[in-house]
């Protein structure tokens, strides 16, 4: 029987670690911070999932005056190409410049392993150097490394270096790959 039909309210129901339902940030007594989110697979949705966390973090910074700041580092999404989410990100940056930074690296077109150039390697390294600095600085509460998995698949960065840096992130920092 669910809470409505049994006459008990959600507040009076015993809480368990398992089950079905939605616990909002307002309902949660403890926020789980410092997670490593990995979104992978074919098709759309990975970047949008990361942007949902970005939006939540910015909302916390606005509403609760928490010390939050987001780095949105977008590998393989150079300035030569427009993306659907660009206008929303730019609006957030204009409205709340103290809460979000964005860096785009790479060229604007798709390429395969056979088409990797020196520029691609330099841009991937430039982005990774920024990411490592952001992680080490502890300035950000959330660091999004959009398209990092394809960068690794293309062999543009050393996987072990990436893993080492992700493992050494400050306590409480969320990283989204």
Language model features by range: what are they?
Residues 34-134:
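Conserved P-loop
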Residues 102-104, 145, 177:
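General beta-strand structural signal in soluble alpha/beta enzymes
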Residues 12-13, 35, 164, 174-176:
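ASCE RecA-like P-loop NTPase motor cores
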Residues 111-171:
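Phosphate-binding/switch loop-helix module in NTP-utilizing enzymes
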Residues 35-39, 70, 141-145, 173-175:
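Generic beta-sheet signal
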Residues 19-22, 124-129, 176-177:
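Short gly/ser/thr-rich secondary-structure transition/capping motifs
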Residues 2-35:
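Extreme N-terminal, non-catalytic leader segments
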Residues 28-29, 90, 167:
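Short secondary-structure boundary/capping segments
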